[in-house]
């Protein structure tokens, strides 16, 4: 899968993320925070401790309007979904039904350069959906 042919849509807050705030980059980090539980008399780990799930990421968009940046300033929750599809019609949807922007940077590197917004986010467990992040797979 690649970002040119296979990203069918990026939705933020339920609406297509499009002009004037086109997405330029998106990253996602998932961590289960598992840990080894060592014990005397055991070769290797005696167990695996469960950790807290974390989903964080960053989205970079052209700064065509203040809409996303304003959500950061106001502390407003949002949502993000990314639909990936292959040429056969199979699809994978990354679903973050509730997230909060944790940091934002608006920058222009110089004259004749585009103004970009880089927003960091953290997914939060949705109260009715019951999850912070999910992958949904659909066969053609």
How does the language model describe each region?
Residues 1-140:
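Signature of extracytoplasmic/envelope-associated structural regions
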């Amino acid at each position: 899968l690649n970002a040119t042919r296979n990203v069918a849509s990026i939705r933020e807050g339920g609406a297509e993320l499009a002009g004037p705030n086109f997405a330029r980059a998106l990253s996602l980090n998932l961590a289960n925070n598992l840990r080894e539980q060592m014990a005397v008399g055991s070769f290797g780990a005696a167990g695996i401790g469960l950790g807290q799930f974390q989903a964080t990421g960053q989205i970079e968009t052209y700064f065509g309007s203040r809409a996303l940046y304003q959500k950061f300033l106001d502390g407003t929750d949002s949502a993000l979904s990314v639909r990936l599809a292959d040429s056969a019609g199979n699809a994978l949807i990354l679903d973050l039904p509730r997230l909060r922007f944790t940091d934002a940077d608006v920058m222009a590197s110089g004259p004749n350069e585009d103004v970009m917004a880089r927003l960091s986010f953290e997914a939060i467990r949705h109260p009715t959906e019951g999850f912070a992040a999910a992958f949904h797979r659909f066969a053609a």
